Each structure stands twice: as C-alpha cells, then as structure tokens.
Regions:
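Short, small-residue-rich loop/turn micro-motifs
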Residues: 63, 269, 273, 359
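Transmembrane helix boundary and interhelical junction motifs in multipass membrane proteins
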Residues: 193-198, 277-282, 292-294, 307, ...
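Hydrophobic alpha-helical transmembrane segments of multi-pass inner membrane proteins, especially
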Residues: 45-53, 58-61, 68-261, 299-360, ...
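TM-adjacent membrane-interface loops and short helices in multi-pass inner/ER membrane proteins
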Residues: 247, 251-294, 298, 307-309
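Glycine/serine-rich anion-binding loops at beta->alpha junctions
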Residues: 140-150, 190-192, 273-278, 367-381
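A juxtamembrane structural motif centered on a specific transmembrane helix
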Residues: 2-33, 352-406
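N-terminal membrane topogenic signal
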Residues: 34-48
Length: 406
C-alpha cells in the first residue's frame, strides 16, 4: 500500500514538473541585460576630428590678417592652437584608456585645484585682464583660463554624489559637493564671467533631472534662480554687461559701441549668403569684427562658407550630442550615465550659446565655440571630456533574448 502511494506521489511530481516545463517553454523569455566591452565610439571620434580640423582652418583664416598687420607670423595663432591640440590629444588618449569609474576618487582634489587656480586669477597679480574681464593667468607665455576647467570639475562632483540619489537636502551632499560648486560659481562670477556661471548652473540642473530629481523641487530651484538673476541684473551686474543686454535686440541704438560687434557679425552672415564668399575671402575679419578668431569665429565661417558651412557645423554638433546621449543611455551604471549626460550637455549647450550670440539670438556672452574657437584651455578641456565619453562608450549594456536553458 505504501509502495503504491509512493509511486503515486512520484508520478504526481513528475506530472507537475512536466506541466511546469511545458509552461516554461510556452512562456516568452524575458530579455536580460549584459555588459559588453567594445571599441570606442567611432562616430563620436570622427565628428570631433572634423570639428577640430574645421577649427584649425577657421582660426588661420580669421587671425592671419591681424598677425600680418602686427608684423608677425600669419600662422601665429594656429601654431599655438596646434600646440594645445597636442596636449589635448594626449589627454584624450589618456582618458579614453583610463577607467572612468576611478575618476570619482579624484573629484574633491580636482575641484580644489580648480578653486585654487580661480583664486589666483581673482586675488593675485597673476590674473590677466582682457577687454575688462579678468579670467586668465599667464603660464610660460600661455594664457590659462581656469573657468574652463570648472566644467569637468562640476560634472565630476555631481556625477559622484548623484549616482545614488538626487536628494538636494542631504547634508553630506552640501559639504562635499554643493559648497565647492558654489565657491567656484562665486569666483567665476567675480571675474566676471556670467556666461560660464549660466553654463555651469544649466549643466547642474540637467544632471539633477537625469539622476531622477524631483520636478517640483526643480521648478522651485528654477524660480529661486530666476529671482537671483533678476536681483543680480539690477544690483551687482557690471555696467558693460547691462549695456550688452540693452543693445542685444536693438544694436542700431549704439552702432559704434555696445552694438558694434553684433552689427558686424550680422553683416558677415548677410555677406555669406548660401555658399559663402570662399575660404579666406572674408571682409569682416579685416579689422571690422573684433575677436573674430575667438567669440565670433562662427560669423567668419558663415561669411566664407555661407549657409552650407553653418549647416555642416551645426550638424556635426548635433551628431556629437546624439552620440553622447546614446552613450549615456547604454552605460551600465549611473555614474557613467551622469558623466556622459553632463559632458554632452556642457559641450552642446556651450556651442548653442556661441552660435546664438554670433547670430544675435542671445546677448554677447564671451563663450568660445568648442573645438573651433581659438583658445587653448577650451580645446584641451573639450578633448579631455571627449576622452572620458569615449571611455564610457567602451562599456555598454546589451539586451540578450531567447536564452536557451542549459
């Protein structure tokens, strides 16, 4: 009797197993994610290479007349930019091969170094004043702009602290992250460099949202930020900055003063037309448009290469932004995602600001066009940040479907 009962139980168990096996076969298998290691993103690398090459050509064309007028080498600015490119290229190579997950350990050290350099600019004779703004320090004949290094410093700080959560009320976050960022913002605002402050604040907001931050808290912070901007505009903003805002939409009110650069930039756009006047044929660079190799280099490109050249450059930046956010979406960890989002937005928004200023959509800001404008600090920092992006792109998530039972 016991033997028959045991056999019955065995048969019942076997039937149950058989039914479950049949159900498992009928049930659709859910995909799971696996981290794979691949080569760096080639599309991103090619895009940056094109931007850098266009930058070399534009810098030489825009700066050669000025160098000749001053009795110097026509390629003087290009040579300096090439030297900075070599430094930036080695930085790109290093960060492409350096595991991005180890960068978090350096966040406070790097932020402290940037704060120290900013203090040298603001409070010591080493600071160099150009066009009323004290933003540079001289090192071995080269001018270094520490505020450019604040971009990766802020991104690294926020990625490190937001990788777990986006709680803005956490006391530890204030001590280790928010206070250093506020110190950097204050030192940069003192130079004054309001455009960089806006760029860093915007990057911080985007990273906060990417980390899953509360929209309610975001709009509260946005309201507080707008109130601060209004107060700053009426109290502590510099007179020349207020004049820029006043003449932004009506530059004809002061054609020889604050509106001069905008008017000359718009003339360059109008002269370029659809296909441009040809490489090297710009008239506006002949002492008409100041800073044509830095802040207004996009206007010279528009004049020489026309609408076609403008679309090409904007398309390259859109490609860079697309690849950067794709890298962020495929990254297997939150730290890498936030790094990719912060770097991509920082470069993309800076390009947007520069192009908007050159085309009179925004007031003059003094922000260079990444990879293209003359400026060693901007080029080195941009290439190093792209190196981090390329490193993140080597590790990505892949969904694997229809895994057979072993």
């Amino acid at each position: 009797m016991k033997k028959e009962e045991g056999c019955s139980r065995i048969m019942s168990y076997q039937g149950f197993e058989s039914r479950n096996s049949s159900y498992a076969e009928r049930r659709p298998r859910r995909p799971f994610q696996s981290t794979i290691v691949s080569a760096p993103d080639k599309a991103l690398l090619i895009t940056v290479a094109f931007l850098v090459i266009i930058g070399f050509m534009a810098i030489f064309s825009a700066s050669a007349p000025k160098c000749i007028d001053e009795g110097g080498n026509p390629a003087q600015f290009l040579i300096k930019q090439l030297i900075c490119f070599v430094v930036g290229f080695f930085g790109l190579k290093f960060f492409t091969n350096y595991d991005y997950k180890k960068l978090g350990a350096w966040n406070l050290i790097f932020a402290g170094t940037v704060i120290f350099l900013l203090m040298l600019v603001d409070f010591t004779p080493l600071g160099v004043t150009v066009n009323g703004a004290k933003r540079w320090i001289n090192i071995l004949g080269f001018q270094l702009q520490p505020s450019e290094f604040a971009k990766p410093a802020v991104v690294l700080l926020l990625a490190t602290i937001f990788k777990k959560d986006a709680d803005l009320l956490d006391q530890n976050k204030w001590v280790t992250t928010f206070i250093p960022i506020l110190i950097m913002l204050g030192l940069i605002f003192k130079q004054p460099n309001l455009s960089m402050v806006i760029l860093l604040l915007s990057t911080s907001v985007v990273m906060f949202l990417a980390a899953g931050g509360s929209l309610k808290l975001f709009f509260s912070c946005l309201g507080a930020m707008m109130t601060t901007v209004v107060i700053a505009a009426t109290t502590i903003i510099k007179p020349y900055q207020m004049q820029r805002i006043k003449t932004w939409q009506h530059p004809e009110l002061d054609p020889q003063g604050a509106g001069y650069n905008i008017i000359q930039s718009l003339i360059a756009f109008a002269s370029g037309g659809f296909s441009g006047v040809g490489y090297g044929g710009s008239i506006q660079k002949l002492s008409y448009l100041p800073e044509c190799h830095t802040d207004f280099i996009f206007a010279i490109i528009a004049e020489e290469l026309g609408w076609v050249g403008c679309v090409l450059i904007i398309g390259l930046f859109f490609t860079l932004i697309h690849r950067g956010f794709m890298i962020a979406s495929r990254c297997p960890d939150m730290f890498g995602k936030l790094l990719a989002v912060g770097i991509t937005f920082s470069i993309g928004f800076q390009a947007f600001l520069n192009i908007s200023v050159a085309s009179s959509f925004f007031p003059t800001t003094g922000v260079p066009l990444p990879f293209i404008s003359y400026g060693g600090s901007s080029l080195i920092v941009s290439l190093c940040m792209v190196g981090v992006l390329l490193n993140i792109s080597k590790k990505r998530m892949k969904k694997i479907r229809n895994i057979e039972n072993v």
